[in-house]
């Protein structure tokens, strides 16, 4: 919502780079599992990537994702480090998305360039890590090797946190995590010593399209449960919630009020398509989200400026149907996945007009 306040409109301020298609795991819930390969192609020239970044006047943040961005030393040296140094020189915030299972020295080597180290942590038990974390892998590693990665992840998170890195662990709300939310939260806070626990509902996208998602009722109960049992001294961030001030549901409003008033709680608007585009460093393809199945590739940096791509996306009927905003609650409405899953027949633009009228923001 900072872009709305500063520029009075949605603005491209965040670029996410897919820097590798390699990963040492094959999580059943991975949003990009279908793209994973055993060998990376050659990346585009970094000068082209720098040029496209230079053309974005309001760039605030950059995300590095994969695959596992820290898996391939070649990718780290040829793509990741150059991007990190570019961001550092320009004063851009950087988030690295990693599973934190790799040797610690790889993370320490880039620590000075990282503002947020983001890890997905959905493991209620070690057995779940061993099964779900490699659920889509055809040839399974030995159990001992899997457990070693789990211990490496815990140790890396704890050590990096102790050394001052901001480590943020994200948990997806789905049928698998629901029974274990308290244990997951305690492990993130006490064992991994993370600075923040992020919570997002799981939506079925591409590779993870067969997931057992939660009903709206179960999801709301899970959020209340987390608010009841959480460590109130640890920052919790809730994102992509399918709960909006403009939906006339009393239970929704009670939950939103609780989220607004509790200590160390933030509710985040979804950045995909509102402030962020994803760029593949190998093909140059640009997508609105890092999972892309709703919209597919919308352009390519070999041909177009990212600011032009973003403006063209905002002019589409799909984007227009989603791009509402409510100043009273600093809410930017749903993304494509949320609308299609929970509110296929809701006109959020009409809701926007009603909310502006009700709260006297014309």
What residue spans do the PLM features occupy?
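Short cysteine clusters
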Residues: 23, 27-30, 270-274, 289, ...
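Flexible mid-to-C-terminal extensions adjoining Fe-S/redox cofactors in radical SAM and related proteins
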Residues: 1-11, 285-362
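Hydrophobic pocket-lining residues within nucleotide cofactor-binding pockets
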Residues: 69, 101-103, 173, 202, ...
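Phosphate-coordinating loops and pocket residues in cytosolic domains that bind phosphorylated ligands
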Residues: 32, 131, 303
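Radical SAM enzyme [4Fe-4S]-AdoMet core and its adjacent flexible, acidic
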Residues: 39, 54, 90, 116, ...
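A contiguous, low-structure linker/loop signature
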Residues: 110, 114-116
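Conserved alpha-helical substructure of the radical SAM core
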Residues: 1-96, 101-109
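Activation segment
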Residues: 27, 73, 104, 128, ...
